[in-house]
């Protein structure tokens, strides 16, 4: 049976992550209070950020920026702003 959490992002009970995906205390907080669906939405935003801003995970400043954006997105309800990104019109 899948574990459920009260997802802070979705503001409802949802299927939790299978294991801790991020290290440290922040990783424990994510595991305890973020759903698979919310994490999946974050991964899409993270990919866009890395690609559009040409971030390198070898750069500590870039990793810190991503972590800040992740906390803002998952826990504070702030949308990720990606300069120059224009969504494709859906038909």
From Swiss-Prot:
What keyword terms does UniProt attach to this protein? Iron
SUPFAM superfamilies named in the record: YggX-like
Per UniProt, what is one Pfam family of this protein? Answer: Iron_traffic
The highest taxon in the source lineage is Bacteria
**Annotated InterPro entries:** Fe_traffick_prot_YggX (IPR007457), Fe_traffick_prot_YggX_sf (IPR036766)
Q: Which GO terms describe its biological process?
A: cellular response to oxidative stress
Q: Does the keyword Iron apply?
A: yes
Q: Which GO terms describe its molecular function?
A: iron ion binding
Q: Which GO terms describe its cellular component?
A: cytosol
HAMAP family tied to this protein: Fe_traffic_YggX
Question: What family classification does the UniProt entry report for this protein?
Answer: Belongs to the Fe(2+)-trafficking protein family.
Q: What functional role does this protein have?
A: Could be a mediator in iron transactions between iron acquisition and iron-requiring processes, such as synthesis and/or repair of Fe-S clusters in biosynthetic enzymes.
Question: Which NCBIfam families has this protein been placed in?
Answer: PRK05408.1
Protein name according to UniProt: Probable Fe(2+)-trafficking protein
Phylogenetic lineage = Bacteria, Pseudomonadati, Pseudomonadota, Gammaproteobacteria, Pasteurellales
């Amino acid at each position: 049976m899948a574990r459920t959490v009260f997802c802070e992002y979705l503001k409802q009970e949802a299927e939790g992550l299978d294991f801790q995906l991020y290290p440290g205390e922040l990783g424990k907080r994510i595991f305890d209070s973020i759903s698979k669906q919310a994490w999946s939405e974050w991964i899409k935003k993270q990919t866009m950020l890395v690609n559009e801003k040409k971030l390198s995970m070898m750069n500590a400043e870039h990793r810190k920026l991503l972590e800040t954006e992740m906390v803002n997105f998952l826990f504070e309800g702030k949308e990720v702003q990606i300069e120059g990104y224009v969504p494709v019109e859906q038909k």
